[in-house]
């Protein structure tokens, strides 16, 4: 089956007259109505056959496309973001609510293929991400990505340039905790590759090799709190999980991720992890770095419902994301006193001493997604 400029073949060697010829014959056939009808019927037959052929071609193309997608989906079991921050939605549509986000270089497990891919992030959250915003990988490709030398962005924002020159065009923006493959170093730039193969250069003052970073990253309360406070002023965004914007649990999740620790994504999940602490009236049994939870208190007929979380920083103060990331206080004498949150305070969870002792609080060098 083929097509050229003059003839459309329904079968090999059986041409049907082209439309221009038929139109000319119809226009010039003035001898009789019978001749006009014959030409008219020939045109109808031609157009009908053309439509049949078009439908057949579309069906074949669709089948080939679907087969290719199925074959790729059968082998591609991982998805890695190719933009600095990728939105993950509750449904396969732009209008669906944003549930969470993933960072460039972060491994995600594919649950369902399609134009919108259903994925699971390292913290166990699931949702739909647009196919074009990720690089799908096979098990072998995912292993290669994880095993390769990588750099991790260590400043809030940075740029990957097309050349080792800050005046060259931008390849991509990146944010804290984005990961890129390390290809080499040229003067004061790391030569890097994004998951989709694009290459560029990032200033060495904006990133560190993962190997060196892991030697110095700390999981103590002082370090976690310092990072949390460094995010003060970031805007609140539902589903936000990056240094561009965060919701309450996304703030906690991001703060810990900057220290290479993966926590559950949502406040209701975080409230079940670690050592449970019923908070003393004078807050004396809280320690800096504890997670403090807020929401609806339990009643005789309803259990407590967690809807907010923050990080306790000591002296009856906590840092959290509500409208924006800021510090609030449980002390009525403090200028930062937060009566609203004090009235809905529920309990605390202690997680820092339990890093790598329970599966829900794990450094990424031991996480299955990063070590696959």
Whereabouts are the PLM-identified features?
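Bacterial N-terminal signal peptides that target proteins for export
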Residues: 44-54
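Bacterial N-terminal signal peptides
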Residues: 53-63
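Boundary regions of SH3-family modules and the immediately adjacent low-complexity/disordered segments
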Residues: 69-75, 121-152, 165, 193-227, ...
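Beta-loop motif signature
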Residues: 81-108, 153-182, 236
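SH3/SH3-like beta-barrel superfamily modules
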Residues: 98-130, 172-204
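Aromatic- and glycine-rich peptidoglycan recognition patches
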Residues: 166-168, 208, 305-372
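Active-site nucleophilic cysteine motif
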Residues: 228, 240-259
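...with weaker cross-activation on analogous glycine-rich loops/strands in unrelated enzymes
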Residues: 263-327, 333, 364
């Amino acid at each position: 089956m083929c097509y050229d400029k003059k003839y459309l073949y329904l079968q090999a060697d059986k041409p049907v007259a082209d439309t221009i010829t038929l139109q000319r014959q119809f226009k010039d056939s003035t001898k009789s109505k019978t001749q006009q009808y014959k030409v008219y019927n020939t045109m109808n037959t031609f157009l009908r056959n053309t439509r049949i052929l078009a439908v057949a071609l579309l069906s074949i193309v669709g089948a080939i496309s679907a087969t290719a997608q199925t074959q790729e989906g059968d082998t591609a079991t991982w998805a890695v973001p190719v933009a600095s921050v990728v939105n993950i939605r509750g449904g396969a549509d732009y209008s669906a609510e944003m549930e969470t986000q993933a960072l460039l270089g972060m491994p995600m497990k594919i649950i369902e293929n399609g134009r919108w891919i259903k994925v699971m992030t390292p913290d166990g959250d699931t949702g739909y991400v647009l196919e074009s915003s990720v690089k799908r990988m096979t098990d072998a490709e995912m292993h290669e990505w994880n095993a390769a030398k990588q750099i991790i962005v260590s400043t809030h924002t940075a740029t990957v340039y097309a050349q080792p020159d800050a005046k060259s065009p931008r390849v991509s923006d990146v944010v804290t905790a984005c990961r890129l493959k390390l290809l080499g170093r040229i003067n004061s730039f790391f030569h890097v590759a994004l998951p989709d193969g694009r290459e560029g250069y990032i200033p060495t003052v904006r990133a560190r090799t993962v190997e060196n970073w892991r030697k110095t990253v700390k999981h103590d309360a002082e370090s976690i709190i310092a990072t949390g406070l460094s995010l003060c002023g970031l805007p609140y965004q539902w589903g936000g999980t990056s240094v561009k914007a965060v919701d309450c649990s996304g703030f906690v999740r991001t703060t810990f991720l900057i220290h290479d620790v993966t926590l559950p994504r949502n406040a209701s999940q975080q409230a079940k992890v670690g050592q449970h602490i019923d908070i003393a009236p004078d807050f004396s049994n809280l320690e800096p770095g504890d997670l403090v939870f807020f929401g609806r208190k339990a009643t005789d007929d309803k259990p407590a419902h967690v809807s907010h979380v923050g990080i306790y920083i000591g002296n009856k103060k906590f840092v959290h994301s509500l409208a924006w990331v800021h510090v609030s206080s449980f002390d009525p004498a403090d200028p930062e006193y937060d009566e609203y949150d004090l009235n809905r305070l529920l309990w605390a969870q202690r997680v820092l001493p339990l890093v790598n002792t329970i599966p829900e609080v794990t450094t990424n060098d031991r996480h299955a997604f990063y070590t696959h």
